[in-house]
Design a protein with these regions (language model features):
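PPIase-associated folding chaperone regions across multiple families
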Residues: 2-5, 9-43, 146-210, 243-338
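Extended intrinsically disordered, low-complexity coil regions enriched in Ser, Thr, Gly, Ala
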Residues: 122-129, 185, 190, 195, ...
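A generic structural-conservation signal
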Residues: 125-127, 235, 261
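Short loop/turn hinge sites at secondary-structure boundaries
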Residues: 79, 215-219, 258
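Peptidyl-prolyl cis-trans isomerase
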Residues: 210-249, 281-282
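N-terminal targeting/tethering segments
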Residues: 35-152
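Sec/Tat-exported extracytoplasmic proteins
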Residues: 64, 71, 106, 110, ...
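Extracytoplasmic/secreted proteins, especially bacterial periplasmic and envelope-associated proteins
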Residues: 55, 59-62, 93-102, 106-114, ...
Length: 338
């Protein structure tokens, strides 16, 4: 074999390189210029690739826009002021957080649905019939705004529902023999009223705290007593995961029903009245959240192990086309439907 290329080989090599470059430019130009051709673009563009397996962008788009619709309908139904651009934490907006969580979920759906097919966990005839029924129901019963926003078609919905059914099947297998108990103390939510008295806003906050405590222990309502001193009694549920000062949290959780006490933390005085040491309804909801988090941790760990053997390639450029710039529902849509 010759060590160096001759002139003809060099020309051929340059032609091949040019062709590859042109193809790359053509592929880049396939990206949608407007909403009209986005459905076609998303159908032909892979969002995830794992070996010879892939998931197209339209499936991820469908799942994400459905989630957007759910949140918008929920918040507008209950009259809550709502914006996707609300800052939440560390410079991120509500939209950022929902997109991140949804992206992780979609990636896990992809990995586990492919795992199911590779491990003889395909859907049974009954499960396939259930998918077909759900697809039909979605296409005939969904609000037209959801159909439009998700760019739904029978084929797309069928692909997504098949994937999520396979995902559910694997999740059931993962969770079959694991510990899914929740410590009651981890879930317990007490219901308290807290009066905060900072020396920045109150003269002699320690004396005010003592006076409020004395009045409450004499049978007066903490909210009414607090207003006498131009203070406010904030009524909240407190549990182990509540985002308040740790010392204050521990103090609240130590109180019994109808107990009122004061505590000083870093020069700030707090008067805390406990309505319920265990708000059962809220505790039940907190327990469900902890249970779902525990399930999610097992599933995520399983997916991460699979990814060590078969890494997932992510098309970040394609994912960046998915956002909540266009609402599925507006406040007016929900008001008119009620």
């Amino acid at each position: 074999m010759k060590k160096y290329l001759n002139k003809k080989q060099i020309i051929i090599s340059l032609c091949v390189a040019a062709a590859v470059a042109i193809i790359a430019l053509i592929v880049q130009e396939i990206k949608p210029k407007n909403a009209d051709d986005y459905a076609e673009y998303s159908k032909k563009t892979n969002i995830f690739t794992m070996g010879d397996k892939s998931m197209t962008l339209d499936e991820a788009f469908f799942i994400t826009k459905n989630r957007q619709a759910y949140y918008e309908e929920y918040y507008y139904t209950y009259g809550t002021s709502f914006s996707w651009n609300i800052p939440v934490e560390m410079g991120k907006t509500y939209e950022d957080l929902v997109l991140e969580e949804t992206f992780q979920f979609i990636k896990e759906v992809f990995v586990l649905s492919e795992y199911a097919l590779d491990n003889d966990l395909d859907l049974t005839a009954d499960e396939k019939n259930a998918v077909a029924s759900s697809v039909s129901s979605f296409m005939t019963s969904s609000d037209s705004k959801i159909i439009t926003a998700t760019k739904a078609s029978e084929d797309l919905v069928s692909r997504v529902y098949t994937r999520t059914s396979l995902y559910d099947k694997v999740c059931a297998q993962i969770l079959k023999d694991v510990d899914l108990t929740v410590d009651p103390e981890d879930a317990r939510q007490c219901l308290v009223a807290i009066v905060e008295l900072s020396p920045q806003y109150f003269d002699a906050p320690d004396r005010i705290a003592d006076k409020i405590l004395e009045s409450v222990n004499s049978g007066e309502v903490i909210g009414g007593v607090a207003t006498v001193y131009d203070a406010t009694a904030e009524k909240i549920n407190v549990g182990k995961n509540t985002n308040i000062n740790e010392d204050l949290k521990t103090f609240c959780l130590s109180l019994k029903d109808d107990e009122c006490k004061t505590i000083e933390i870093n020069g700030v005085y707090y008067v805390v009245y406990c309505y319920l040491q265990n708000d059962e309804l809220v505790t039940a909801s907190a327990k469900e959240v902890l249970l779902e988090e525990k399930k999610a941790s097992y599933i995520t760990a399983f997916v991460e192990e699979l990814e060590k053997e078969n890494p997932v390639t992510i098309n970040t450029e394609a994912w960046e086309t998915v956002n909540f710039d266009e609402p599925v529902f507006t406040k007016n849509d929900i008001v008119q439907s009620q």
